A protein has these predicted regions:
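Catalytic core of membrane glycerolipid acyltransferases/transacylases, capturing the structured
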Residues: 64, 98-134
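Membrane-proximal helical "anchor" segments flanking the first transmembrane region
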Residues: 1-103, 110-111
Length: 134
């Protein structure tokens, strides 16, 4: 399996995102249980418009392909795609050097995947501070 995922990760990120979106939507339509749970969860959260339902499937598929790309690409390649504002970098840098505990809340799984790579490639080198990602 490792060799297959390594091979998949060599494909361009944009292609993987598009492919993942197609697979995610296909799974959404072919799995009645997944589709029902998705609709129920969205309705409970106040999203009743049908356009949201298939977007969840597409984005879940996209995220799965992005994760493979992040996990199996060299850190330098991943870091070359990270965009962060100077203000955010300053805030995170200050927190890292403070020695105080930090809790990172990320908007989706992809950010959760990239955050440790980014921290290791930037602030860890400066501070030597270890982090735990849960």
């Amino acid at each position: 399996m490792h060799w297959l995922l390594s091979l998949v990760a060599k494909l361009p990120l944009g292609f993987l995102q598009g492919f993942g979106a197609c697979i995610g939507e296909l799974v959404f339509w072919l799995s009645p249980g997944y589709r029902r749970r998705t609709r129920d969860n969205l309705r409970h959260a106040g999203y009743n418009e049908a356009k949201f339902f298939t977007k969840v499937g597409r984005n879940a598929g996209r995220q799965s392909m992005e994760s493979i790309w992040v996990w199996y690409r060299p850190a330098k390649t991943v870091l070359s795609r990270v965009k962060i504002s100077p203000q955010a970098e300053h805030i995170i840098g200050s927190a890292m050097t403070s020695g105080r505990p930090i809790v990172f809340l990320t908007p989706h799984v992809g950010c959760f995947e990239i955050l440790p790579v980014w921290l290791a490639g930037t602030h860890y080198e400066k501070t030597g501070r270890r982090i735990t990602i849960l």
